């Protein structure tokens, strides 16, 4: 009793001091409106209050007593994350990509004073590639939901690259090119991320006037909402890549012709040398045109070397360091020429991905002539050194990036592949080790940069919480809270299931979590890896055994569809591998028998996934077609969307393989069937015909899976 009285005396004192300070902008209204979009009129009963940031970092408090709920925060996103935390922990409720489990308990359940400060100034989200693998054809309705979700997870620094090409077009017109020359430069929408990073030109293009205009309008809506919520979006900047027509008009400039991804030269980029006066001129124009359209911004992303090495003599170290020094200085100056207050943001992915090129002296050279307070490095993939590169984490190799500000980030998804993978133990602890490291340098942020969204929701829920935690998270405790909020209960079998998931699929990160039937034959370039162990399959059986108790939960049912589909697909995988073995040993009848077993199981998988809210080709195609304004444009966008998740282009075949209804039935199954015929050499021709032919849904959803 005494403890309670003291606690509320402290609360009252806090309230008194809070009332003496007000933020420069209204942080309450945007947060309240967002919460209303989640729970409707119930939001009217919530009290909202502003509190001062702590040491320049966001802080929030939650108090619920006698039916009165008060959310306090230092920013709109802090209040939104406070609401998300309260709903998850006190109301046992959750809203995710795949659905929701929202209890309507009123009055608001009591909840102890909950106070939390983020150890990070910035909490970053998205990946350049997300704008290809997930969002290329999204409309405002879908973007609004995603920005809401970001705020609920406490994100305050999202990437915002929509409409980059519309701005670039204006710049190139001012540089003397005509529209035809400019449009030939751009790829189709789903491949634009790689165009923006200088990896790819022309592929599946061009872009229409209508597309450019619509993207400008969409970006206005995106930025307006992000800014209302107090987010600090990262805008695109010029990275040195120019249209072929521009290179041809300036033969005296020594452009470097880059190579990437196994594409023919005509699709590869030309990059300006750093000593060209064009570099700063074009960079300045780009920032000016962007801000003329969208308003002032602080953070600008420019990546000139993503997964590409400069065509230089690697043995001449001094020449290499000199060139990198010049590039770093020129990129920085090209951005600040357009806005002196701008900060250059760059992805640190390539520093780890090509670690043999980016030794200490090379990265020091790139950074050497850029002021420490005018650059942020997103150390993108801290999960990859352990699981793929077999190196130390990049920030450790480079001593906390030599005084530059940096963000600790993960890449928990590649290509939008949606089978189960992720190292939960790492996600619950590795960033905390960085926070406490003596050589962490100027670590100011935490983030996640998935190439594809709408998958492995447990991973993103955990990462959201890590953005607000100075300590490692106890996964045993956290999983109980997660399951109770997601499913409405945590029976013993569920607990055992998740222990096994954490021991199997969620104990590691695979770059290419694909089944063999998704690649026809084993991919020797990018080795597919997926957990099919007995423990993993037992986890699915245990999860399914909770159906009677939890079947009223939408999220339980959706996860059940997903997990049982994996179970059946794993059985299909065994038959398919045997079919391949039979085929290689010329056992024709045995191969056909095992192939048919594979097909029968995969058809069951397809029927199940047709009832899942996310794992359907139908929605992917629908977004693409809805982005077109003419039949020709609709067909082109559909083909582009389907190409990305199948043949891709270059050496990226099946990189973005999806475990989706519609794709399994109409693409993966016919393709493996064709392989087991005398016409297997016609697979590429068949793929192209499927990609370029309009697809239509031919399967009825199962209402009660």
Language-model-detected regions and their locations in the chain:
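Catalytic-core regions of glycoside hydrolase
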Residues: 43, 94-109, 126-130, 151, ...
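Active-site-adjacent substrate/metal-binding segments within catalytic domains
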Residues: 120-139, 150
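Contiguous, structured surface segment used for ligand recognition
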Residues: 21-120
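Sec-dependent signal peptide recognition
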Residues: 2-11
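Residue-level detector of conserved catalytic or cofactor/ligand-binding positions
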Residues: 700-705
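Ordered core of a single globular domain
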Residues: 553, 557-606, 665-666, 671-699
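C-terminal functional modules
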Residues: 517-550
């Amino acid at each position: 009793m005494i403890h309670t009285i003291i606690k509320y005396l402290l609360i009252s004192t806090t309230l008194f001091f809070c009332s003496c300070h007000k933020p420069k902008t209204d942080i309450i209204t945007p947060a309240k409106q967002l919460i209303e979009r989640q729970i409707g009129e119930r939001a009217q009963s919530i009290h909202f209050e502003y509190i001062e940031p702590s040491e320049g970092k966001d802080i929030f408090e939650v108090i619920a007593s006698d039916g009165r709920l008060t959310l306090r925060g230092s920013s709109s996103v802090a209040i939104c994350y406070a609401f998300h935390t309260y709903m998850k922990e006190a109301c046992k409720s959750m809203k995710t990509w795949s659905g929701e489990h929202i209890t309507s308990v009123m009055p608001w359940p009591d909840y102890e004073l909950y106070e939390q400060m983020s150890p990070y100034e910035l909490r970053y989200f998205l990946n350049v590639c997300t704008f290809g693998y997930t969002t290329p054809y999204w409309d405002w309705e879908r973007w609004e939901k995603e920005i809401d979700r970001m705020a609920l997870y406490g994100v305050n620094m999202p990437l915002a690259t929509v409409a980059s090409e519309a701005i670039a077009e204006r710049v190139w017109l001012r540089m003397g090119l005509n529209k035809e020359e400019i449009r030939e430069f751009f790829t189709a929408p789903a491949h634009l991320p790689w165009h923006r990073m200088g990896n790819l030109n022309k592929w599946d293009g061009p872009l229409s006037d209508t597309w450019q205009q619509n993207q400008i309008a969409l970006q206005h809506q995106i930025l307006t909402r992000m800014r209302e919520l107090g987010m600090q979006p990262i805008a695109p900047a010029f990275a040195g890549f120019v249209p072929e027509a521009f290179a041809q008009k300036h033969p005296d400039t020594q452009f470097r012709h880059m190579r990437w991804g196994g594409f023919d030269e005509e699709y590869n980029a030309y990059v300006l040398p750093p000593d060209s006066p064009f570099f700063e001129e074009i960079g300045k124009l780009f920032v000016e045109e962007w801000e003329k359209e969208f308003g002032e911004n602080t953070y600008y992303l420019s990546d000139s070397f993503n997964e590409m090495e400069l065509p230089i003599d690697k043995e001449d170290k001094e020449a290499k360091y000199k060139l990198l020094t010049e590039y770093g200085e020129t990129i920085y100056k090209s951005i600040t020429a357009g806005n002196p207050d701008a900060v250059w943001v760059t992805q640190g992915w390539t520093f780890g991905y090509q670690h043999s090129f980016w030794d200490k002296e090379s990265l020091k050279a790139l950074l050497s002539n850029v002021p420490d307070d005018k650059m942020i490095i997103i150390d993108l993939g801290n999960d990859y050194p352990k699981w793929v590169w077999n190196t130390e984490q990049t920030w450790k190799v480079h001593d906390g990036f030599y005084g530059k500000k940096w963000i600790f980030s993960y890449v928990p998804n590649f290509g939008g592949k949606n089978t189960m993978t992720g190292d939960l133990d790492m996600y619950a602890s590795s960033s905390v080790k960085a926070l406490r490291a003596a050589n962490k340098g100027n670590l100011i942020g935490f983030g996640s940069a998935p190439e594809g969204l709408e998958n492995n929701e447990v991973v993103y829920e955990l990462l959201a919480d890590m953005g607000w935690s100075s300590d490692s998270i106890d996964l045993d405790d956290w999983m109980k809270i997660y399951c109770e909020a997601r499913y409405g209960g945590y029976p013993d079998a569920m607990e055992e299931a998740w222990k096994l998931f954490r021991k199997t699929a969620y104990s590691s990160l695979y770059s290419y979590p694909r089944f063999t039937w998704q690649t026809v034959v084993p991919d020797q370039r990018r080795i597919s890896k997926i957990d099919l162990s007995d423990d993993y399959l037992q986890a699915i059986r245990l999860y399914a055994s909770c159906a009677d108790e939890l079947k009223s939960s939408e999220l339980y049912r959706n996860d059940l569809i997903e997990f049982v589909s994996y179970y059946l697909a794993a059985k299909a995988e065994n038959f398919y591998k045997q079919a391949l073995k039979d085929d290689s040993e010329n056992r024709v009848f045995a191969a056909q028998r095992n192939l048919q077993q594979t097909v029968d199981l995969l058809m069951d998988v397809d029927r199940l996934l047709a009832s899942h809210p996310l794992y359907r080709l139908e929605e992917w195609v629908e977004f693409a077609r809805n982005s077109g304004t003419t039949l020709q444009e609709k067909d082109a966008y559909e083909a582009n969307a389907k190409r990305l998740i199948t043949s891709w282009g270059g050496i990226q075949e099946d990189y973005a393989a999806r475990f989706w209804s519609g794709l399994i039935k109409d693409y993966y199954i016919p393709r493996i069937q064709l392989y087991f015929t005398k016409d297997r050499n016609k697979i590429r021709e068949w793929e192209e015909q499927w990609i370029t032919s309009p697809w239509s849904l031919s399967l009825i959803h199962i209402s009660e899976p």
